[in-house]
Structure formats: C-alpha cells, structure tokens
C-alpha cells in the first residue's frame, strides 16, 4: 500500500484540523472543511488505510482519527508549510529584537519570553557563556585603596568583567597602568580558557616583580571571570494546563517536575530530532526523558561567527502548531540576517 498524493493531502488536513480543534477528525469533517475533490466515503477508506499504515490512530471514544507520532513526523518532514504571521506578531517580534540586538544573550532570553506569550507554549532559552568563548581585548587594574585593586577585563564581544584583588604591596595607579599594559600585550587575543600552565608561567616570569599580584589576578581570571557553562530561563511553565492533553493531574505534575530540573531540560533540548532548516524537532517518544514523552520540543539554534551561543525551545503537546513556530523562527532569522 503506497502513500499517494490523495492520502498525503488527507493526512495533512487531519493534522492541521486536529492541531486546531484537539478533537478526533472524521471523514465528513474533512469533506466539509477541505476541497479535496473526493467524497466522504472515499476519504473514510483512505483514512482506514492511513491508520493501517500507522499514520493515524482511532481513539476508543470516537469514530474519528487523530495523528500518530509517525503521522506528525511525516507532516513535519514533508507536508508542513509556513503559516503567515499577522502584522501584530511581526511588530512585537521586531520591537523585542531591535531592543536587544547588540546583546545576543539578552536577545535570546527576552525573545523567548515574548514567544511564550505569542504561542501559549512553554519556552526555554539557553545561552552558552560568551565570556568563555570571547577573547581578551583589554585588561585594566585600578587602585581602590592601599591593598585592594579592581581587575577589569574587556572582551572582543563587548563583555566587561570585574574582580576584586588584594595585594600585600602598595602599587600606585601609574604602576598598575604599566602592569595592565604588559598584561594586555601578553593576553591580547587569548581566550580565558587558553590560560594553560605554560602561558601562566610565561606571564609570571615576564612580570616577576609582582608575582604575588599576578598569582591572584590569574586565579581570578580562571575562576571568578568564568561563568557557568550555560544560563537557562524558562517562560510559560503553566501554559501547558490550557491544553486538554494535560488535564490529567498526574501528567501535568510530571511535566512541572521535569521543568524544575535545569540540567534535564538542557539535555533534552540538545537531543537530536527531525532537522528542518535551523530547527530541531523532537516528537513524543523520541524524547530521551520519560517525563517529556507526551510532548514535542522544537528548538532553534543561534550562532555568532559560527560559534553556538544559544537556543530557544518551544515545549508543548505533540499536537503543537509546528507550522506557526516554523514561521516565527524563519521571521526571526530574517530579522537577524538584516542586522
């Protein structure tokens, strides 16, 4: 039994209608709502074939059919087309992105918050630590008082990091300026993660007169200046309750328990799913996490100069409006490419 064009059109219609209504779809409904050029009886026969092929499921309480995970996957892979965003959505997205366009981490987190409101799904923003990916542009030491020095590091990404240092030797600002210039020359273009033992030994040798201060400075660079591997923000955690699939209290509780586990969420959205443009789509049981197997997770990845800087993920029922999310992400990519 083959998947001919008629079966594909019927499957597409069922998926779209079920996403919209959350109700099992019958042949008469398809016949009335979609101009497929065939009778309700023919549609009914084709639906029976689609069920036999594993693309549809018949719930016990209904004569209609709903898409299976296999049906959703075929829809996402081959049948889905972008939906048209309304002008209001476009304006809100553009305003949010314009406000944060010079700060990629803030852009990702703030846009994720807006997208949760626009889609009524849970969204997760994950950004990698940019300070660890950046390279050093300038180092400045500033005298605060007799024993305290402020370390300021500026990176090529425009990030500014500070740390307080303590020294047993008084150093006036002119000496600190000389040390700052020397350190900047030695570390210019180096990533903080590049500070291996050989480089540290070389710096201490070159500025041996102030070895005590250099020890503390390098320790600050290696610890205080480094950030967590990623930061994660979650929006719309309770949006899931608006979907009938999660009316079951235990299912809803399991979902909320999953959202409380930051590392679990970060791992889930990195899992491999269906690839469509810059989207990764994980449907139902393809989720490695058992608590997420009633959900679909759609993730968009963002890069700066080919380096991964963050992801925005949408979490919702498998009856997710994939086409709308696809359109939103494509519109965001269009705006980013214009900048």
UniProtKB/Swiss-Prot annotation:
Q: Which family does it belong to?
A: Belongs to the HrcA family.
Q: Which domain of life is it from?
A: Bacteria
Q: Which GO terms describe its molecular function?
A: DNA binding
Keyword Acetylation assigned to the entry: answer is: no
Q: Does the keyword Repressor apply?
A: yes
Query: Would you kindly state one Gene Ontology biological process term found in this protein's UniProt entry?
Result: negative regulation of DNA-templated transcription
Q: Sorted alphabetically, which keywords does the UniProt record give?
A: Repressor, Stress response, Transcription, Transcription regulation
**Name of the protein in its database record:** Heat-inducible transcription repressor HrcA
Q: Which Pfam families match?
A: HrcA
Protein task: Negative regulator of class I heat shock genes (grpE-dnaK-dnaJ and groELS operons). Prevents heat-shock induction of these operons.
Gene3D superfamilies, alphabetically?
A: 3.30.450.40, Heat-inducible transcription repressor hrca homolog, domain 3, Winged helix-like DNA-binding domain superfamily/Winged helix DNA-binding domain
Q: Which SUPFAM superfamilies match?
A: GAF domain-like, Winged helix' DNA-binding domain
